Structures are given as structure tokens and as C-alpha cells.
Design a protein with these regions (language model features):
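Symmetry-related core transmembrane helices of the 12-TM Major Facilitator Superfamily/SLC fold
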Residues: 194-211, 411-426
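Helix-to-loop junctions at the C-terminal end of transmembrane segments
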Residues: 89-101, 186, 305-317, 402
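Residue-level signature of mid-helix packing/kink "hotspots" within the transmembrane helices
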Residues: 83-91, 176, 299-307, 391-392
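C-terminal ends and interior cores of transmembrane alpha-helices
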Residues: 111-124, 328-340
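Juxtamembrane intracellular "pre-TM" segments in multi-pass secondary transporters
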Residues: 15-35, 218-259, 441
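Cytoplasmic helix-loop-helix junction between adjacent transmembrane helices
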Residues: 132-172, 366
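Helix-loop boundary and gating motifs at the non-cytosolic
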Residues: 32-83, 257-258, 262, 266-284
Length: 441
């Protein structure tokens, strides 16, 4: 059976009685074949990341110095709100993309970003900051999730790890550069409004690129579904209920559920770094410029190293990169507590970034390995629900522990959780990607 005949048999749109030659040719999957749209989506994702980077150097200090938030748990409330909203939005973003098309969800996400910098600039109370982070969480959940899924759609199974490495490189390098820029601007002009003018430009450009230039990837999803079904001798239209996908991603499937817990702990670390590190460094009498550099080093290392780790997972597999990466993160956090001073903390921040880079794109690639194209968006949404709940869990846990026992104790507790997560991956997660098997296909 030829590809076009299989397409005609399995695609409802092709069952119209039209001759086989009249059926449009399916798009070709691959990074090289779709490099223009892939590069555009990387650029869009960079602007998505830059929106988060606006807050990483400045907002914890803003809460303490301008709004007089007395407790660390209160200061970290903006991270918890962001994480909770983003996690829930991730869940629906994948399902909405599967049902209504990826581009529509991407554009909608950018619309929620437009008011965010204005709310922070004009905020008379901390409640306005919380509202801004609710909108930012929706923006990130819709826009970043959809950009990830669209890249998975474009490249197909063989280069998925490299694709995720490139995607997260663009996003988190932008997070780092934005955090550095806002911190430097704040050190010269004040904590607001000047640092947040950048956000107005980021949101406007990201929206314009998404509306004008991004194309939907529905046909690429259909092409991969047909190819997988042809290889398996099954129907390409097989669907799985949301409840079933949620169960697989939460407890039933060892690969998907173990990836979900690792993602949650990974972002618990990131929530800690976002909300607590600037205050931890400030308490050690570091300058705002030094704090900006430290908040830059972690996501910058994370972003750059992902260029190698994503592709490396395509060659060596996913499991052990994830397990070792989680353990390295735990060791780096322990170093933050054991060491003191700008240079030792810089080394720990770099190590934390390397560990995160080993994990972050590899987890997404593992989800893509296991999930079928027809329910891939939903599976990514379930994974990102649990992963980004880590922001909320991390902010609450770190805030409560820091108020009760001090910031160093909070960081140490999270380091222990991270090491345990790496052990769980080593013991429970199966290998999801066997390069030699793909090469033989």
C-alpha cells in the first residue's frame, strides 16, 4: 500500500470519492525540512521566555523594598500564583491545540501577555502584582506549551531531543538575558518603571510574529499519525480520552508519570531560584549588579548547554541524562548552602544550570517518544501541569521553611528532594528512546 493510498483510507477528509492523485501531498517531517518555521517558533519562544525574565532579578526585591512584604512566604506568593495558573493552563493548552489548532492557542496566549508589564509598572499594591502574574501564567501556559508542541509536530521522532534542546535554549537564554538586562537597568534607574518597558516591546513583537508569520502544524500531526499507523498496521485516527491520558501521565505509565515527578521537582528548584535566590544573595550583602549576574548565570547555562544535551539524548537515550541531571541539581543546591560568596555561588549556579539542561529538554523528548500524535498535545499538557505545579510547590515550601528555619535550611531541604527524585528516575523510569532501533527503520 502506498503512502497516498494509506492516507486516503485513514484520513476522513480523503474519503470523498476523489482520485488518489487529487489528495494533497502530506508535509515532510524533519528539522532541516521545516527549518524556517522551526526557527520562527524558536524566536517566538525567546520572546515568551523574555517575559518571565523581566521578573527574575527585580520582583522579589520589589516586594521587599517597595511593598514592604514582611514574610518570605508572602514575597514568594507571586511565584506560587504564577506556577499554579501556568500549570492549569498547560493542561488545557494541549487539549485546545489538539482540538482547535496550535496557532490559535499561541495567539491567544500572547494576548494575555500585553497587560502584564503595565500592571507591574502601575501597581499601587502587591495584589496588582499577583494579578499580573495570573495573566503571565496564562500567557506562558498557552504560548510556551504550544510552541513546544508545534516543534515536536514539525521534526518527527528521530530529532526530537535536538528540537527540544533548541527550543529550551532559545527560551531560557532569553530568560537569562532579560533578567540580566532588567537587573542592570534597575541598578541604574530603580526597580520600576524602567525595567518593565522592555516587556511592552516583548509582548507586542511576540504577538505580531505569531499572527503574521506562524503557520499551524495540523497537517504535520496527521502525517506522523498516518506514518505510525502504517508501520503498526492500525488506524491513524485512534484517540484516547483525557481521563486516560491524565492517568497515564500521573501514575499509570512508568515513563510518563516518572517524567512528571521529575519535572515537578525540577521546577520546584526553579521556583526556589526565582523567588528566594535574589533575597538570599541580598542578605549576604551582594550588590544588585552581582545579584543580576548570579540570576543570569543559572538560566544562561541552562539555555546554552541544552544545545548539546537535547541532541545527546537522541544518541544515547533519555533515562540516564535525566537521572544524573537531577542528582547534579541536588548537589549544586547543596553547594549554595555549603559555600558562601560571589564566586562559589557562581560555580554553583553554573552547575545547577548544567544539571537542569540535562533534564529539561530530555523530559519533553521522552513525553514525545511515548505519546501518540493523536493525543500528544494532551500528554504534553498533563506533563507540563505537574512540572509547572513545581513553581507553586517550591514557592510555598521554600517560603514556609525559610520563615521557620531560615533560607539556607529551605535550600537544603529542596536539595535533598532533588537527589531523591534522581534516584526515583534511575529505579522506575524505562528507557523511552533507543537510537539503534530508529536507525533500522
Amino acid at each position: 500500500m502506498t503512502d497516498l493510498e494509506f492516507h486516503a483510507r485513514n484520513d476522513p477528509a480523503a474519503r470523498t470519492g476523489a482520485p488518489i492523485s487529487a489528495i494533497p501531498r502530506a508535509p515532510t517531517l524533519g528539522l532541516r525540512e521545516n527549518w524556517q518555521q522551526f526557527s520562527l517558533l524558536m524566536l517566538v519562544n525567546a520572546f515568551v521566555g523574555a517575559m518571565v525574565g523581566l521578573e527574575r532579578s527585580v520582583l522579589p526585591l520589589l516586594g521587599e523594598r517597595e511593598f514592604g512584604i514582611a514574610t518570605l512566604s508572602g514575597t514568594l506568593s507571586f511565584v506560587a500564583t504564577f506556577g499554579f495558573v501556568k500549570a492549569l493552563t498547560n493542561l488545557i493548552a494541549g487539549r485546545l491545540g489538539d482540538r482547535y489548532g496550535r496557532k490559535n492557542v499561541l495567539v491567544t496566549g500572547w494576548l494575555f501577555a500585553l497587560p502584564v508589564p503595565l500592571l507591574v509598572i502601575w501597581a499601587p499594591t502587591w495584589k496588582w502584582i499577583i494579578v499580573a502574574n495570573i495573566l503571565l501564567g496564562i500567557n506562558q501556559g498557552l504560548a510556551w506549551s504550544t510552541a513546544v508542541i508545534m516543534k515536536i509536530d514539525l521534526v518527527g521522532p528521530k530529532r526530537r531531543g535536538l528540537a527540544m534542546g533548541l527550543n529550551e535554549f532559545a527560551g531560557y537564554l532569553a530568560v537569562a538575558l532579560s533578567a540580566l538586562a532588567t537587573g542592570m537597568i534597575a541598578s541604574r534607574y530603580g526597580l520600576r518603571p524602567q525595567p518593565f518597558y522592555l516587556g511592552i516591546a516583548f509582548a507586542a513583537i511576540g504577538l505580531a510574529l505569531s499572527v503574521i508569520f506562524v503557520r499551524d502544524t495540523t497537517e504535520h500531526v496527521r502525517a506522523e499519525a498516518n506514518s505510525r499507523a502504517r508501520d503498526a498496521g492500525t488506524s491513524a485516527t485512534t484517540t484516547v480520552s483525557f481521563r486516560e491520558v491524565f492517568a497515564r501521565g500521573t501514575w499509570r505509565d512508568p515513563a510518563l508519570s516518572t517524567a512528571s515527578q521529575a519535572g515537578l521537582i525540577n521546577n520546584l528548584n526553579d521556583g526556589l531560584a526565582w523567588g528566594l535566590f535574589p533575597l538570599f544573595f541580598a542578605a549576604a550583602n551582594l550588590s544588585l549588579q552581582q545579584i543580576s549576574v548570579l540570576t543570569f548565570l543559572y538560566p544562561a547555562t541552562w539555555g546554552v548547554v541544552q544545545l548539546g544535551t537535547g541532541g545527546l539524548s537522541d544518541r544515547v537515550g533519555r533515562k540516564w541524562l535525566i537521572a544524573v541531571g537531577m542528582m547534579l541539581q541536588g548537589a549544586a543546591l547543596a553547594g549554595m548552602v555549603a559555600w558562601r560568596g560571589f564566586l562559589p555561588w557562581s560555580a554553583a549556579a553554573v552547575a545547577l544550570g548544567v544539571g537542569t539542561a540535562m533534564v529539561y529538554p530530555t523530559l519533553l523528548a521522552a513525553i514525545g517518544d511515548v505519546a501518540q500524535p493523536a493525543w500528544r498535545g494532551t500528554a504534553v499538557g498533563v506533563y507540563r501541569l505537574w512540572r509547572d505545579l513545581g513553581y507553586a510547590v517550591g514557592a510555598v515550601l521554600a517560603g514556609v521553611l525559610a520563615d521557620a528555619f531560615g533560607m539556607a535550611s529551605a535550600i537544603g531541604a529542596v536539595a535533598a528532594l532533588t537527589l531523591l527524585s534522581g534516584v526515583l528516575v534511575a529505579l522506575r523510569m524505562p528507557e523511552t528512546h533507543r537510537p539503534h532501533a530508529l536507525q533500522q527503520q
